[in-house]
């Protein structure tokens, strides 16, 4: 059990049986009445974000999340299949369960799958991935009036803005949290 006075951003607690992550919180001490904690929580099962108010010192159970390292195998159109490297069990996840991570998945990539009571909640991708540029317009020397970037299609199908010097066939690093170009690999 964890007290609402110990809330921190990123903490996972169980609210009404669902695992929730604290996004924001604020301790409020009104002039009259008892202090309370106003928190913005993200339900990890549904993805919904809700604001809740708790009495100061109220105890909530901590949500125990398991993380398993798995290898991405393939996509059959409906599901994305991952293999547990220890037991060799395969798990099929929908695009909804993977979230935005679908855009950066490459075959044989190692990712962490997050479980709560045996149910898959989502995945944690590495912060950066290396992807190959398969299509982009050639950069014209001296053409920086447009901000110095151009669109590029990567091997996974995602389109992002890259600097003018990046060419087809280049391997680049992409930040999976923001979807931004980092550097050439």
Curated annotation (Swiss-Prot):
Do the record's keywords include Ribosomal protein? no
- GO CC terms of this entry: cytoplasm
The alphabetized UniProt keywords are: Cytoplasm, Elongation factor, Protein biosynthesis
Q: Where does the source fall among the domains of life?
A: Bacteria
Identify the pathway: Protein biosynthesis; polypeptide chain elongation
| Gene Ontology biological process terms from the UniProt entry | peptide biosynthetic process
Query: According to its UniProt record, where is this protein located?
Result: Cytoplasm
Query: GO molecular function, one example?
Result: translation elongation factor activity
The record's Pfam families line, in alphabetical order, gives: EFP (PF01132), EFP_N (PF08207), Elong-fact-P_C (PF09285)
PROSITE patterns to which the protein is assigned, alphabetical: EFP
The similarity annotation says: Belongs to the elongation factor P family.
- Please give the function described in this protein's UniProt entry: Involved in peptide bond synthesis. Stimulates efficient translation and peptide-bond synthesis on native or reconstituted 70S ribosomes in vitro. Probably functions indirectly by altering the affinity of the ribosome for aminoacyl-tRNA, thus increasing their reactivity as acceptors for peptidyl transferase.
Name of the protein: Elongation factor P
Q: Which organism is it from?
A: Desulforudis audaxviator (strain MP104C)
Which gene codes for it? efp
